[in-house]
Amino acid sequence: MSRQWMTLMAILLVYIPVAIDATVLHVAAPTLSVALGSSGNELLWIIDIYSLVMAGMVLPMGALGDKIGFKRLLLLGSAIFGIASLCAALSPTAMTLIASRALLAVGAAMIVPATLAGIRSTFAEASQRNMALGLWAAVGSGGAAFGPLVGGILLEHFYWGSVFLINVPIVLVVIAINAKVVPRQPARREQPLNLLQALVLIAAILMLVFSAKSALKGQLALWLTALVALGGAAMLTWFIRKQLSAARPMVDMRLFTHRIILSGVMMAISQALW
């Protein structure tokens, strides 16, 4: 096997637990409710915080990868992912589990752009790169699909923390393999990080989701829910305007005028909702 395909296998190995963790808790709600005494709202945050934080952190982590090199980003993200998995497995309360899942998402947000950058730099030929990207997408979809199955099997035979604890040995093996196999990419120190904009985006997403959950459950006064929603919308508007005016934005908003990209985004949103 050529070094290119060995590199791809190493990259895909670290991506598998990232994909599985997006859905592994979908069957764990009753178990978590009993084990941690968590409320319905806390259960929703335990499940959703991973995707929400990851969505806001992927873009700045891609910029961080440009600054430090994507191999370093991959190894750092894997280490954070493993530590967060251990913290999640040992969480004594719902709030500590939510915090651990948020940290888990930070590690995942480092891994995702690092794997894509690794594929792009490893495969110079377009046909091979397209095949590698197809395998990457298949691993992501397959991991998310198998997440509930993996979670169900582990919960049936072990305690609830095993759905996170299983990540630790996988991450240790993956770090060792990637440190040896994945080639080092050159860093671009001039790439802006825009951490403030990333934090604003995360805050906007969390505020909008929190207001939607609160409105459905009626836990807050209507005026307070509306205020949180308006705050989130204002932050999101500020973020979009910053991207439109920046010389080197984190997101090129003009991409959303492309029909293929826009239709893909809409399909992804529809799939996530249903």
Model-derived features with residue positions:
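Helix-loop-helix hairpins in multi-pass membrane proteins, especially solute transporters
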Residues: 66, 70-196
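A membrane-interface helix-boundary motif in multi-pass transporters
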Residues: 156-168, 212-225
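Hydrophobic alpha-helix/TM-entry signal in multi-pass membrane transporters
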Residues: 4-11, 74, 81, 97, ...
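Short hydrophobic/small-residue motifs within alpha-helical transmembrane segments
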Residues: 51-52, 141-142, 268
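C-terminal membrane-cytosol helix-exit motif in multi-pass small-molecule transporters
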Residues: 168-187, 202-214, 230-246
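Extracytoplasmic
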Residues: 3-51, 56, 111-112, 116
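Small-residue-mediated transmembrane helix hinge/kink sites in multi-pass secondary transporters
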Residues: 30, 62-63, 116, 151-152, ...
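12-transmembrane solute porter fold
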Residues: 4-20, 25-27, 40, 222-231, ...
